[in-house]
Structure formats: C-alpha cells, structure tokens
C-alpha cells in the first residue's frame, strides 16, 4: 500500500521526508507527524536568487519562506509546528529534490591541507546524541525533557 502512496506522491511532484532523518531525529514531533516536500517553482528560485544576500537574517527569511511554501503537513499541523533545528536541513532537501542533484559544501580540510567537498545527505550528518542521563528524563507523550520540574524541548518556528 505504501508503494501506491509513494507513486501518487511522485505524480503530485512531492515526496515524503522521513522525520527520523531530520536533525531533531523526529523525537520532538507527535507520533503522527509527517512531512512532504515539493519541487520549487522557477519563479520562486528566481526571487530567491534576486534577493539572496550575505545578510544571514535575510537568508533565513528566504529559507523559511521556501520551506513554508514547499512543504505539506497533515491537516492538524502547520508550518509553525516544524522545529527550528530542522529548517535548514528541510530547505537543503527541497533544493536536492528540485534540482535532482547532490547538494555539496566546499570546505578546507586542515588535516590534508586541501579544499574538499562533502555531500549533504542524512548519511553524512552528525546527529545529536542525547546523553543517557537526559534520555531518562524524556516524556514520550509530551515530547519534552522534564528536569527538576522544568520542561524542555527544542523551539519550533512558531
């Protein structure tokens, strides 16, 4: 049955992004939370390129706009439910899905002394490992850590 849904999604120009592949690893989302990404329209790419700047606050606004326009969530969720730690990763997945090409970042390798590039994919991403002492404080129903009566979670966009 899942293959039929994947086929229908591909006809709609969208694909499901596994929540476990996100930087948050999905632990702060409700169990029924799902996320689909769509390919970006040419006019939005042109607008992004026209407005792109080295000002990080402008870049973040543009990234959030693209993510908001090109993600689909179940009806009981909104863009504001997406965790802020996942936004840039989702944006890069949208870029990869739209261009059908790898997203690579160039960097200088201090050990080898040469410039290299790395592909940004879940396999190359270092996920946060929750310390064992903190894992014991996690409430799976509320999706929060509870320490000394205080509740902690990663911030959402909203």
Where are these regions (language model features)?
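Short, surface-exposed, charged amphipathic helix/loop patches that serve as local interaction elements
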Residues: 1-158
């Amino acid at each position: 049955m899942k293959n039929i849904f994947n086929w229908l999604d591909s006809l709609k120009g969208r694909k499901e992004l596994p929540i476990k592949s996100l930087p948050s690893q999905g632990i702060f989302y409700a169990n029924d939370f799902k996320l689909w990404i769509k390919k970006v329209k040419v006019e939005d790419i042109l607008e992004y390129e026209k407005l792109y700047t080295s000002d990080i606050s402008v870049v973040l606004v543009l990234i959030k706009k693209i993510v908001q326009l090109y993600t689909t969530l179940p009806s009981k969720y909104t863009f504001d439910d997406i965790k802020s730690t996942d936004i840039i990763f989702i944006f890069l997945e949208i870029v990869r899905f739209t261009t059908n090409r790898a997203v690579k970042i160039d960097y200088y390798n201090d050990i080898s002394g040469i410039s290299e590039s790395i592909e940004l994919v879940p396999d190359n991403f270092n996920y946060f490992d929750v310390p064992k002492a903190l894992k014991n404080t996690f409430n799976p129903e509320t999706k929060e850590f509870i320490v000394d009566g205080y509740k902690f979670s990663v911030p959402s966009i909203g």
